[in-house]
C-alpha cells in the first residue's frame, strides 16, 4: 500500500515538472548527516518520504503523512527554466492537494515549513518541507478466498405484544425442494 502511494506521488511530481528538476526521488537512508547533506547537492530537486501515520476514521484505514522535501537555490525563480521554492511549492500543492495516489485518497495539505538554518541559506540553498495527509486503507488480514461459504447461522426474532421470542438455525445455502411445497 505504501509502495504504491509513493510510486504514484513520485510519478505525479515528474509529470508536474518534466525535466525542470534535477532529482525526483524517495528519501532513503537512515537520516544521518550524510543523508541530509545529500538533499542540498542537486537543487532544484524534490525528495519524498513517508512520515508515519495516525488513527483513521475506521479500523480499516490510517491517516498517512507524506513529506516532500523541496530544495532550490532561489526563493522566487522562473516558472519554466529555473524554478525557485515558491514555484515548486505552488505547483506541488496544486498537483497533489485533493487527489488520489495509489490506494491513498484525499491528500490534504497540512503544512509548509522552511527547514533551512542560516548556514544553508548563506550557502545559497533553501530547503522547504511540504506535508500532506491522506487516507490509506489497511490490507485485509483475512484472505477471503480461504473462507468456507457461509452455511448456517442462529437467528432470533422478537414479536410485539409480549409474544415470546422465536429462534432457529437457518441453513443459508440449502436447496429448496419447490415440488414438496406445492
Curated annotation (Swiss-Prot):
One of its GO terms (cellular component) is host cell cytoplasm. It comes from the Viruses. One of its GO terms (biological process) is viral tail assembly. Disruption phenotype: Accumulation of free heads as well as free tails longer than normal and variable in length. The keyword Thylakoid does not apply. Keywords: Host cytoplasm, Late protein, Viral release from host cell, Viral tail assembly, Viral tail protein, Virion. It is found in: Virion; Host cytoplasm. The keyword Heme does not apply. Induction: Expressed in the late phase of the viral replicative cycle. Expression of late genes is activated by the viral late transcription activator C. This is Probable tail terminator protein. It comes from Escherichia phage Mu.
Amino acid at each position: 500500500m505504501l509502495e504504491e502511494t509513493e510510486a504514484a506521488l513520485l510519478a505525479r511530481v515528474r509529470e508536474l515538472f518534466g525535466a525542470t528538476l534535477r532529482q525526483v526521488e524517495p528519501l532513503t537512508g537512515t537520516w544521518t548527516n550524510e543523508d541530509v547533506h545529500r538533499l542540498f547537492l542537486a537543487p532544484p530537486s524534490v525528495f519524498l518520504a513517508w512520515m508515519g501515520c495516525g488513527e483513521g476514521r475506521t479500523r480499516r484505514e490510517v491517516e498517512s503523512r507524506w513529506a516532500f522535501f523541496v530544495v532550490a537555490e532561489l526563493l522566487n525563480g522562473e516558472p519554466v527554466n529555473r524554478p525557485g521554492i515558491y514555484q515548486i511549492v505552488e505547483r506541488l500543492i496544486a498537483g497533489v492537494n485533493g487527489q488520489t495516489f495509489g490506494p491513498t485518497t484525499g491528500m490534504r495539505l497540512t503544512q509548509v515549513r522552511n527547514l533551512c538554518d542560516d548556514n544553508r541559506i548563506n550557502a545559497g540553498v533553501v530547503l522547504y518541507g511540504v506535508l500532506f495527509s491522506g487516507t490509506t486503507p489497511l490490507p485485509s488480514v483475512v484472505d477471503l478466498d480461504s473462507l468456507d461459504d457461509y452455511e448456517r447461522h442462529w437467528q432470533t426474532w422478537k414479536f410485539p405484544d409480549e409474544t415470546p421470542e422465536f429462534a432457529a438455525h437457518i441453513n443459508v445455502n440449502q436447496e429448496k425442494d419447490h415440488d414438496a411445497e406445492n
